[in-house]
Design a protein with these regions (language model features):
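N-terminal hydrophobic/helix-forming segments and targeting peptides
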Residues: 1-239
C-alpha cells in the first residue's frame, strides 16, 4: 500500500506499508502492529537517518486512495468512510439551494473531523435542535442485510438502540418511495450522534448511510447506495 509521509506541504516523503510476513498462507495474521511495517522510499538505515529527513513521531501517514469508479457504478477508494457521506450532505445542500427547496423544519448540516476518535458530534450543536441524524457509512458483511447499493438504517450500535420513532419513520418512507434499504445492528459501531448523547444533548437520534464494504481498508460502495441515502435524507427532511 503506497502512502505519502508528511508533516506539512513542503515536507512530503513517499513509501509503502507492507506485511513483515508476506506469505499469508504460511503465518497466522497476528496483530496489526506486529505484522506491518512502513518502508520509506529513501536510503535510510537507522532512526537517525529518518530523523534527518524531518520525520518524527506524530507525523501523518496518508494512504494513496486509488479511487476508481467503474462503469457498473461501483466506487472503490480509501476513505469512503466517511468522505462519501460528506459528499451526500454537500449534494443535499446543493439540491436545496439550486432547486429552492424548503425543508419542513429548520435543518443544520454539521461536518466533523473527529468522528473516528469519538467526540465529533459532542459540540457545536445549536440550542434549538431536537433531532439529529448521523449520515455515516453502513456496514456490509457477514450476517448483515445491507449491501453497497443500499442505504443502511441502523437500529442499534455499541451505545444502544436509536430512536424508535425516527427509525420507524425512515423505514416507512423507504418502503413508500421504493428506496433500497436494509435495517441492521452494528455492535462495534459508533457515530457522531452517539457523541452528542454522551455530551448530554437530549435529542432524538438516527443513523443512516450508504453501504460500504471493507471499511478502514480499500473500501467499496456503489452509486446507488449514495443515491438511496440522498433520497431517504430528502424524504425525511423535505417531504
Amino acid at each position: 500500500m503506497r502512502f505519502p509521509f508528511f508533516r506539512n506541504r513542503d515536507s512530503v516523503k513517499n513509501g509503502i506499508l507492507i506485511s513483515i510476513r508476506r506469505t499469508g498462507d504460511g503465518f497466522h495474521p497476528g496483530l496489526f502492529n506486529d505484522t506491518m511495517e512502513a518502508l520509506l522510499d529513501e536510503p535510510v538505515h537507522s532512526a537517525e537517518d529518518v530523523g534527518k529527513l524531518g520525520i518524527m513521531a506524530g507525523d501523518f501517514v496518508c494512504f494513496d486512495p486509488r479511487t476508481v469508479v467503474t462503469k457498473s457504478g461501483y466506487i472503490k477508494s480509501r476513505f469512503l468512510d466517511d468522505k462519501l457521506s460528506t459528499c451526500i450532505l454537500l449534494g443535499y445542500a446543493k439540491y436545496l439551494k439550486e432547486e429552492q427547496v424548503q425543508p419542513k423544519r429548520q435543518v443544520y448540516i454539521l461536518i466533523t473531523s473527529y468522528e473516528e476518535v469519538g467526540h465529533g458530534g459532542a459540540a457545536s450543536i445549536p440550542e434549538n435542535v431536537e433531532e439529529m441524524i448521523s449520515v455515516d457509512m453502513g456496514c456490509v458483511g457477514e450476517g448483515l442485510g445491507c449491501d453497497e447499493t443500499m442505504v443502511s438504517i441502523c437500529a442499534k450500535d455499541s451505545m444502544g438502540p436509536y430512536d424508535y420513532q425516527v427509525i420507524s419513520r425512515m423505514v416507512e418512507l423507504a418502503k413508500e418511495q421504493s428506496i433500497g434499504f436494509a435495517v441492521d445492528i452494528y455492535p462495534h459501531y459508533g457515530s457522531d450522534v452517539d457523541a452528542a448523547l454522551k455530551a448530554g444533548y437530549d435529542i432524538r437520534h438516527g443513523l443512516i448511510g450508504p453501504g460500504v464494504y471493507a471499511s478502514h481498508g480499500y473500501e467499496r460502495s456503489h452509486r446507488l447506495g449514495a443515491e438511496n441515502t440522498f433520497r431517504l435524507l430528502c424524504a425525511y427532511t423535505v417531504a
